[in-house]
Every structure is written in structure tokens, then in C-alpha cells.
Curated annotation (Swiss-Prot):
GO terms for biological process: steroid biosynthetic process. Changing H284A: Almost complete loss of PI4KB- and TBC1D22B-binding. Homodimer. Interacts with the C-terminal cytoplasmic domain of giantin/GOLGB1. Interacts with PBR and PKA regulatory subunit RI-alpha. Does not interact with PKA regulatory subunit RI-beta nor PKA regulatory subunit RII-alpha. Interacts (via Q domain) with PI4KB (via N-terminus). Interacts (via Q domain) with TBC1D22A and TBC1D22B; interactions with PI4KB and with TBC1D22A and TBC1D22B are mutually exclusive. Interacts with C10ORF76 and RAB11B. The central Gln-rich region (Q domain) is involved in binding to PI4KB, TBC1D22A and TBC1D22B. The C-terminal GOLD domain is essential for giantin binding. The GOLD domain is also involved in homodimerization. (Microbial infection) The GOLD domain is involved in binding to the picornaviral protein 3A. Residues 174-257 form a coiled coil. Residues 514-516 are annotated as: Membrane-binding. Residues 34-45 have a biased composition (Pro residues). Residues 182-240 are annotated as: Charged amino-acid region (CAR). Residues 340-350 have a biased composition (Basic and acidic residues). This is Golgi resident protein GCP60.
Length: 528
């Protein structure tokens, strides 16, 4: 504490607070004594002035404490700050604005300093406070004002400090309001920042969950794809193994004939022979699988038809049907004559059937016919140029005609081979085997009209004559059904193992074409 005493001004600085008397109370005024008035005797505890500017006595005991708490709540509701925070604002305003924004009186400054001491150090205690000199007027005034507060609590002192400062300067309310706005703005920003962080955290958690979900879905998709790929690979290996087994079985049956055919096509060229053999084996396998699928489809259709006809399953079959049922299923007979002749009178045909069985043997004794092998090759131009050198190997099939090339089996042969091609258009082709012992081994060509003409001729004769005529015809088995072949694009070839002695019938069917004749380049030969 520092004190300055002169004729014009008296100032006291306590803890950063400057106290100076009002001009009208300066010691240099006219008639005023040069020395300060003597200090009054100390009043007993509790007999000092109250904390208010009007000198009201404080409320004793618990009533005073309760009143201070209630006053603190009212201040907080009014100013928007807690008591501690509001007192801090008031103290800072007093230190910053004293002598600038407002000019409190000498007594008001003494009271404000005393209240600040009461808040900071508690009630005045003469035993702990140092003595003040007799001539220290301001020190004595300050101590007297502090002692007058008595046992005022810290909260009451802060309340009185705020209320007194508000009475001294009307700018204090504006100062607090600006800080309140700033506080609210900071609180708003804090809440916005917390909300932003909360949203960012939620968004981050959501993205993490989505990423985890996508990762799990991707892992599941990869797992399913891997399982599917493994299953497909296993299926491919199984089919490949099955294919190798089937091809090995088929190749063991056709090795000799394919080798002979390749040797004839490329004599002395082993590499080309092996390439051709592999092509023939692959085509033979594809043809075998196609026939196998057709047989399975036919079996399924037959089973379905059998289920549909279960209502008539109890009807008895004719004797002729029972005989025909014993024929092996892999022998597809197209001997329509034999079928027609069984549908006729049974008594009338018994002697002829017995005679046929004595001469040719029973039908069931016929050997099983092996499946044919068929393939194609693209060298159609070279093939036709080679065939044109032999005029007998080029035949013309007129429009609506069917040309049959009869090729008897050879005593020294085991397999029959055929090759054919056309110029610009396709043609029907099929192979049949006629069970007849022909003494002539020469190849012959027979031209006939459409097969419909033969059927019309058979319809014009009686049943008895037709039965006799059909009975005299030899048995006929279908080796390759007649289908239209794209032989104008590539060479069609095939082979078949002799089922026995007989005649092969190679049919070139142009009955469907009413306007064009077809030139056929063909070649047939046998191998052992």
C-alpha cells in the first residue's frame, strides 16, 4: 500500500485499486484541517454498518446465509452468470474502467475495496493485520470500512460488490450483457462443435459399418465364386476323365479302320496321319455322345408314353408282337414288309415264316449291328478334283429322284468306308444294310423316284399280294438314317463294321428338290 498526502490530492493504491477523495472533501479545501480526523473507537463485533450503501444492519445467523443464497440465485437469473463468474466480471470491470469509463466517490471506492478484501481474506482480524500509522488517513478509513463488514460471508460480500458496482456505473450492466452474449455465442459454438463432432463420429461409425458390411459381402461373394469355380473345375475334370474313358473305349474299336483310312489319305506322311486320326476320333466321340443323348431322350419319351398308356396295359398282345419284342433293342429294323406281313392273317403266314426261318435262320439269330462312325473334313476342293478323274465316281441325282448305290460286302473286307460331296447344294444321305448273299461283288447304281411312289404302288395291290411280295424281300436294317447333309461345304465320310454278308445301300435322296439336279462325288472302299 502506498499513500501520498499533499495540499491538492490524496490517493491510496491497494492491490491495484486506486482510492482518492472527492474534490469537495480534499484536505486543501477552505476551512478543512490539514490532518485527518482521529479514528473512531473500534466498534464491537456485529455492531458495524451493514453491507449496503444506506448502512442497513446485516441479518444475523442463518437468515443472513439464506438471504445471500437467494440473492445469488436472483442475480444469476438476472445476469445469466453464476455468482463467482459474475463477481469476476465485476472485479475486472472495476480494475479496467475506474477513472476511465466511470468515477466512483471516495466512500464507494473504500466500500468496494473493503468488500474485495472480505471476499479475498475473510472478516477483518486485527491480530493478523499490521498496524496502521496515525497519519495514514486512507489506511485507517480502509481498515475501518473493512472492520465494519463484520462477519459477512464471502457470498454476501460478492453480492454486495456487484450491486454496489452496478449502482455506481450504469455501463456495468452493458458490460455484463456483452459478456453474456459472448458467452452464449461461445456456448453455441461449443454445442455446434460438439454436434459436428458427434455427427462426424456417427458418420465415421456408419462408414465403418458399411465398409465392414461391404467387406463381408465381398468375402462372401469371393467365397461363393471360389466354390463355384472349384465345382466347375471338378465337374470339368470329371467330364474330361469320363470323355477320356469313353474315347479310349471308342478308339480301341476304331483304331484299325481309322489307321487304314489315314494311311490311304496321306500315304507315307505319319504326322498328317496322326492329325487326321485325332480329328476322326474326336468326331467319332461327338457323334457317339449325340446318339447317346438321343437314345436317352427316346427312353424318357417312351417311359412317359408308357405311363400315359397304363390304362390299356392289361390288353393282351398278339403272338406276332410278342415275337417281334424279342428282337434286340439296338437293331433298328426298317423292314416294313416284315411288319406288314405280321399284321396280316396269322394262319396264312405261318408256312412262309417257317420256310424263311429254315432258309435264313430266325431273326433273333442275326448279329448285333455296330454303330457307324461319321466325320467331316474341309478339303472338299481337293477331294472333288481327285474324284473327277474317275467318271464312274460322279453321279447325277435328278430332281425328285433317289439314287441308291449298292455295295456288296467283300470276302476279304471287315469295314466299309464312304466319302461324298456335292457342288453347290445339300442332299439327303443314309446307309442301309440288306441281309442278302449277293454273288456279285461289283458296285452298282440304281435310280428310283421318290419313296412315296413305292408306297402308292403297294396301296394299289391287295393285302394278300402285298404280303407275298414283302415276304420275298430280304431283311433291311438302317445303319445311318437319311438326313440332309451340308456336303457342298465339306466332305462327309464314314465307316461301318460288317455285320455279316450282305449289301450296303447308300441312298442319295433328292426327292425334296423339285427344280434342281445334284452332282454327287463319292468313293467307297473296304478295309480289313
Amino acid at each position: 500500500m502506498a499513500a501520498v498526502l499533499n495540499a491538492e490530492r490524496l490517493e491510496v493504491s491497494v492491490d491495484g485499486l486506486t482510492l482518492s477523495p472527492d474534490p469537495e472533501e480534499r484536505p486543501g479545501a477552505e476551512g478543512a484541517p490539514l490532518l485527518p480526523p482521529p479514528l473512531p473507537p473500534p466498534s464491537p463485533p456485529g455492531s458495524g454498518r451493514g453491507p449496503g450503501a444506506s448502512g442497513e444492519q446485516p441479518e444475523p445467523g442463518e437468515a443472513a446465509a439464506g438471504g445471500a443464497a437467494e440473492e445469488a440465485r436472483r442475480l444469476e437469473q438476472r445476469w445469466g452468470f453464476g455468482l463467482e463468474e459474475l463477481y469476476g466480471l465485476a472485479l475486472r470491470f472495476f480494475k479496467e474502467k475506474d477513472g476511465k469509463a466511470f468515477h466512483p466517490t471516495y466512500e464507494e471506492k473504500l466500500k468496494l475495496v473493503a468488500l474485495h478484501k472480505q471476499v479475498l481474506m475473510g472478516p477483518y482480524n486485527p491480530d493478523t493485520c499490521p498496524e496502521v500509522g496515525f497519519f495514514d488517513v486512507l489506511g485507517n478509513d480502509r481498515r475501518r470500512e473493512w472492520a465494519a463488514l463484520g462477519n459477512m460471508s464471502k457470498e454476501d460480500a460478492m453480492v454486495e460488490f456487484v450491486k454496489l458496482l452496478n449502482r455506481c456505473c450504469h455501463l456495468f450492466s452493458t458490460y455484463v450483457a456483452s459478456h453474456k452474449i459472448e458467452k452464449e455465442e461461445q456456448e453455441k459454438k461449443r454445442k455446434e462443435e460438439e454436434e459436428r463432432r458427434r455427427r462426424e463420429e456417427e458418420e465415421r461409425e456408419r462408414l465403418q459399418k458399411e465398409e465392414e458390411k461391404r467387406r463381408r459381402e465381398e468375402e462372401e461373394r469371393l467365397r461363393r465364386e471360389e466354390e463355384e469355380r472349384r465345382r466347375i473345375e471338378e465337374e470339368r475334370l470329371r467330364l474330361e476323365q469320363q470323355k477320356q474313358q469313353i474315347m479310349a473305349a471308342l478308339n480301341s474299336q476304331t483304331a484299325v479302320q481309322f489307321q487304314q483310312y489315314a494311311a490311304q489319305q496321306y500315304p507315307g506322311n505319319y504326322e498328317q496321319q496322326q492329325i487326321l486320326i485325332r480329328q476322326l476320333q474326336e468326331q467319332h466321340y461327338q457323334q457317339y455322345m449325340q446318339q447317346l443323348y438321343q437314345v436317352q431322350l427316346a427312353q424318357q419319351q417312351a417311359a412317359l408314353q408308357k405311363q400315359q398308356e397304363v390304362v390299356v396295359a392289361g390288353s393282351s398282345l398278339p403272338t406276332s408282337s410278342k415275337v417281334n419284342a424279342t428282337v434286340p433293342s439296338n437293331m433298328m429294323s426298317v423292314n416294313g414288309q416284315a411288319k406288314t406281313h405280321t399284321d396280316s392273317s396269322e394262319k396264312e403266314l405261318e408256312p412262309e415264316a417257317a420256310e424263311e426261318a429254315l432258309e435264313n435262320g430266325p431273326k433273333e439269330s442275326l448279329p448285333v449291328i455296330a454303330a457307324p462312325s461319321m466325320w467331316t473334313r474341309p478339303q472338299i476342293k481337293d477331294f472333288k478334283e481327285k474324284i473327277q478323274q474317275d467318271a464312274d465316281s460322279v453321279i447325277t441325282v435328278g430332281r425328285g429322284e433317289v439314287v441308291t448305290v449298292r455295295v456288296p460286302t467283300h470276302e476279304e473286307g471287315s469295314y466299309l468306308f464312304w466319302e461324298f460331296a456335292t457342288d453347290n447344294y445339300d442332299i439327303g444321305f443314309g446307309v442301309y444294310f440288306e441281309w442278302t448273299d449277293s454273288p456279285n461283288t461289283a458296285v452298282s447304281v440304281h435310280v428310283s423316284e421318290s419313296s412315296d411312289d413305292d408306297e402308292e404302288e403297294e396301296e394299289n395291290i391287295g393285302c394278300e399280294e402285298k404280303a407275298k411280295k414283302n415276304a420275298n424281300k430280304p431283311l433291311l436294317d438302317e445303319i445311318v438314317p437319311v438326313y440332309r447333309r451340308d456336303c457342298h461345304e465339306e466332305v462327309y465320310a464314314g465307316s461301318h463294321q460288317y455285320p455279316g454278308r450282305g449289301v450296303y445301300l447308300l441312298k442319295f435322296d433328292n426327292s425334296y428338290s423339285l427344280w434342281r439336279s445334284k452332282s454327287v462325288y463319292y468313293r467307297v472302299y473296304y478295309t480289313r
